[in-house]
From Swiss-Prot:
Protein name: Pescadillo homolog
CDD domains per UniProt: BRCT_pescadillo_like
Described purpose of this protein according to its UniProt entry: Required for maturation of ribosomal RNAs and formation of the large ribosomal subunit.
Low complexity bias: start-end ranges: 616-627
Keyword vocabulary terms for this entry: Coiled coil, Nucleus, Phosphoprotein, Ribosome biogenesis, rRNA processing
UniProt organism field: Drosophila sechellia (Fruit fly)
Amino acid composition bias (Basic residues), ranges on this chain: 540-549
Compositionally biased intervals (Acidic residues): 454-469, 497-521
């Protein structure tokens, strides 16, 4: 039997270096990177790097050998090789100035088809939805770029078209759930086919080119090349799921004959599609409001998990109310307010919206419409105001969506200091620090109900205690009266007769009195016991030695650390580091909160002092004038 050589089996054969992979595939480094991005192959980190590198100690980029074998059978490899041949022949034609042959070659430029790769990487539609977050974020970013060196204008236009189509689906399906404004952009979260899809839309600022090449636009452009094909497939499937025509089209009522539509119908339609303010054409010819079916709780409770089912039903009812949150409201967006995010929000929840026609095409009514209920303004003052509408700041729309109810508008008027904009993506169960504003907004109605019920229970307990006290007082008074009567008869009544000289009938009466006294004693004891049960006793102060408590916690932690298995020590240390970082973050947030509150308190005190000084000065001036 032949003795096996070293590094011929095990971890050494499971990994392959990037240089060896390039030799195996016969590709350049740029083509290999492009192929790996399109196929979803990425470098791996071995458990024992020295073994995986066959004894070498230098740091190399390693891939799974199975992944490289998987790339060998890909048809794109041949297309990438054809690129080299095309580049050589086209450069030769350009050098000898054979432009006729060069034109013919450019018409036969080899194109990469990625349809089969999308189907291969995402076997089911749900798999594609799970990986839609990065796709949407990157395409929304590229849709804002102008024509750059490595980003052609056609690619940016394609990203813009696909993202607008996806937003039309979100509006038509009313699947938007959460929104948030941050320094990075606008966060949106939609629920599609039971999957939560979150993406970021950047702020609408002018593009500023960077002098330093810190971002590799070439690699990002390869990702965009794959994601555009993927989102195209996804939009097609989503539109047909709602019986919407794809590509998006308008009903004949929208395309009325006008000078603008007759001049260039294609640009007219594309502008109206980008406006996100019109209903799309449906293939079923019937437009009905999709209503969720009521759940038969009697049948579902037989499963033995009624609490979970009731919670699901409550969540479904909240979502159904959220879908019609802005129904019956008409909004008007001022020219200084970002148009597209607010149009997405308002139309996703059943509202109507318009803007100045000079800003963008697709407005349906002007500012003078008397039926407008809310006008969104982001300036300190406005010259002309209507009494029939509320002038609010844009944050009101976002906060209403996150709270799933229409909030009072008095805190969002023009010139008002806005309340904190809380993130809906925070998990209250995982995060230990919760701002007081969020605690107040969690469920104020439930808090009031609890307070009211506690007051009622306290009143009832107080009434019961008063009743018991009155009964005890009556029993004690009756007992005292009986004792006084017995003593009076014992030591002499009004006739001067002693107890020893009384008749036998008096003895019988005394025995009856003794029995009554015993009954009263028992009743008094019982009432006193009941009072002791319901009465509040003064508590005792137990002094806690913080040093001993801290020492006990440290000892317990050390004992846990010693009990951890050696193979789980790294995981244990990681969990401890995460816990310490969370505690540190919570401490910093609380410290920041205290600093802000102290500064606000000092500012209020200063303002009060200034007001008093001004009032005193005004009073002194008035007194001088009076004299």
């Amino acid at each position: 039997m032949r003795r096996p050589k070293k590094y011929e089996s095990g971890e050494a054969t499971q990994y392959i270096s990037r240089r060896a992979a390039l030799r195996k595939l016969q590709l350049s480094l740029n083509d290999f990177r492009r192929l790996c991005i399109l196929k979803g192959v990425y470098p791996r980190e071995p458990k024992h790097r020295r073994r995986a590198q066959k004894g070498s100690s230098e740091i190399k980029v390693l891939y799974h050998t199975k992944d490289i074998r998987f790339l060998l059978h890909e048809s794109i490899v041949w297309t990438l090789r054809d690129y080299k041949i095309f580049a050589k022949k086209s450069n030769r034609d350009r050098a000898i100035k054979d432009f006729r042959n060069l034109k013919r070659r450019l018409a036969l430029f080899p194109e990469i088809k990625l349809d089969h790769i999308v189907k291969e990487r995402y076997p089911t539609f749900i798999d594609a939805l799970k990986d839609l977050d990065d796709c949407l974020t990157l395409l929304f970013l590229f849709s804002t770029f102008p024509s750059l060196h490595l980003i052609p204008r056609e690619q940016s236009n394609l990203c813009r078209r696909l993202t607008i189509e996806f937003l039309h689906y979100v509006i038509a399906s009313k699947s938007l759930r959460k929104v948030f404004i941050s320094i990075k952009g606008y966060y949106f979260q939609a629920e599609i086919k039971g999957q939560k899809v979150t993406w970021i839309v950047p702020h609408y600022y002018p593009f500023k080119p960077q002098s330093r090449q810190e971002v590799d636009f070439k690699v990002m452009s390869i990702f965009v090349e794959f994601y555009t094909i993927m989102l195209g497939f996804t939009n097609f499937r989503l539109f047909h799921g709602l019986n919407l025509a794809y590509p998006p089209q308008f009903p004949s009522s929208v395309l009325q004959d006008s000078e603008e539509s007759l001049k260039d119908e294609a640009s007219f339609v594309s502008d109206r599609i980008a406006a996100l303010n019109f209903e799309l054409l449906r293939t079923d010819k019937v437009q009905e409001d999709e209503e969720e079916l009521d759940i038969d709780m009697e049948l579902l409770e037989q499963d033995g998990d009624s609490k979970r089912i009731i919670k699901m039903k409550q969540e479904a009812q909240e979502v159904s109310r959220l879908r019609t949150l802005f129904k019956g409201l008409k909004f008007f967006i001022n020219r200084e307010v970002p148009r597209e995010p607010l149009v997405i929000l308002i139309r996703s929840f059943g509202g109507k919206v318009s803007w100045d026609s000079s800003i963008f095409a697709g407005s349906t009514y002007d500012e003078g419409d008397e039926t407008i209920t809310h006008q969104i303004v982001d300036r300190p003052s406005i010259s002309t105001q209507y009494i029939s509408r509320d002038y609010i700041q844009p944050q009101w729309v976002f906060d209403c969506v996150n709270q799933r109810q229409l909030l009072p508008t008095n805190k969002y008027f023009i010139g008002e200091t806005l309340p904190p904009h809380l993130s809906p993506f925070v998990d209250s169960k995982r995060d230990s620090y919760i701002p007081p504003e969020e605690k107040a907004l969690l469920d104020p109605s439930l808090i009031e109900t609890h307070v009211q019920s506690d007051d009622d229970s306290e009143d009832e307990a107080q009434e019961e205690e008063e009743t018991v006290d009155q009964e005890l007082l009556d029993a004690q008074l009756q007992l005292a009266y009986q004792q006084e009567t017995a003593e009076y008869k014992k030591f002499g009544g009004p006739d001067g007769v002693n107890e020893d000289e009384e008749d036998p009938e008096d003895d019988d009466d005394n025995e009856d009195d003794d029995e009554e006294e015993e009954e009263l004693d028992e009743k008094t004891k019982r009432l006193q016991e009941e009072k002791q049960k319901m009465s509040v006793q003064s508590g005792k102060v137990h002094k806690v030695n913080k040093r001993q408590v801290h020492k006990a916690e440290v000892d317990e932690h050390r004992l846990q650390a010693r009990m951890v298995k050696p193979r789980h020590r790294n995981l244990f240390r990681k969990l401890i580091r995460e816990k310490q970082s969370k505690e540190k973050e919570e401490w910093l947030l609380r410290k920041k909160r205290r600093t802000i509150e102290a500064s606000e308190k000092e500012a209020r005190k200063t303002a009060k002092r200034e007001a008093r000084k001004e009032a005193a000065a005004a009073a002194a001036k008035a007194s001088k004038l009076g004299k």
